């Protein structure tokens, strides 16, 4: 079959269980597509054909023996921030260019246990710091919808791989929008779960109180299948929460859009820099939900102006602490011929980290320094609590909150925006991480240049099933999620 890449996860699972095709055939199909198409997209940093085919053969044996799970034999790609035993894990950095993890991240462990086949590792912004995937040490990834545009970040490789049909779904991480924004830029569905819903064990840390892993796929249904695998408590992650996990696939039709109260924050739709076409597409999608029976309720989120300064004190502060472990001594990049120990530290870090990572380490170190700790970091944590309370107050009157996932569509590679401009572009996504809430992006149309636009829905704690269900029903009534970039239509 030449069009296996056009099948949904449900259709792939059905085809495998009915022996219409084997996992080996499916895996070979994707490997051929990667070999032909990815040199243009540059989504993968490491492709693992031998391991993938070995896992596919094991999946076929399990399917034949009747020992298969719902997803046995289906391929996926992992963001290169998840530790993978025996496979290089770089986090997009020269610092970890030759790092091979001795263990699997819990998310990877769970996908293997479910019989999923790892195609390889996909590109990302260095240490997940960025919104374009341009800061990666191996080079920029292209947006399949326009190869001279960025796919977003930091999970840009995950988004590009799925959008180009080089993987049926992929794992991502979201510290301030890194699943939702690239999903928006590439016309995909992407879910950032509640903090603590998915294990962080084995994820190379950026900001520990903000990082969360989640699925990226074409549809809410496809995301639900992957959430069923990766969600759940993990004793190896102290921030993982002991809470019963929903059957996200079974719950896809459990939330009625009829009567659903969708909060429309006044402040969000009056942000300077919100593109008129993005605003129009988002408003059209909300009108569609209203036609389906939802009720649009105008709300206030009065802390909106505090999002960016608060996030860009807390996240860099945590990053400066987490990244202090990379000193050239135990693992990671080591400079050549250091004069002494201090020279080893200084040069290894200066040469191993890229400019954006260095910038955030400097900001974070400054915020944590003795003279400024109370004035900046402690104050930011207090404001963080106010942002959380702002959301909780809103949820007393609405079920979900709607917003754009990004103020613009994808911009051109090398546009070299001012860092502050880039930070301001995160305004719609970062508060969700500060509050620890779940949120989802759904594709809702295109701008005049045929670049995708995304709608973000923010839910209350542990409402992943509700968010997936709302988007699933929206996708039953629209076809934006089925649209494919021209490059994805190519056959290997």
Swiss-Prot record:
The active site is at residues 79, 154, 178. The keyword Secreted does not apply. One of its GO terms (cellular component) is glutamyl-tRNA(Gln) amidotransferase complex. Gene3D superfamilies: Amidase signature (AS) domain. It holds the Pfam family Amidase. Signal peptide: none annotated. It catalyses: L-glutamyl-tRNA(Gln) + L-glutamine + ATP + H2O = L-glutaminyl-tRNA(Gln) + L-glutamate + ADP + phosphate + H(+). Keywords: ATP-binding, Ligase, Nucleotide-binding, Protein biosynthesis. Its EC number is 6.3.5.7. GO terms for biological process: translation. It comes from the Bacteria. NCBIfam families: gatA (TIGR00132). Belongs to the amidase family. GatA subfamily. Allows the formation of correctly charged Gln-tRNA(Gln) through the transamidation of misacylated Glu-tRNA(Gln) in organisms which lack glutaminyl-tRNA synthetase. The reaction takes place in the presence of glutamine and ATP through an activated gamma-phospho-Glu-tRNA(Gln). PANTHER family: GLUTAMYL-TRNA(GLN) AMIDOTRANSFERASE SUBUNIT A, TRANSAMIDASE. Heterotrimer of A, B and C subunits. This is Glutamyl-tRNA(Gln) amidotransferase subunit A.
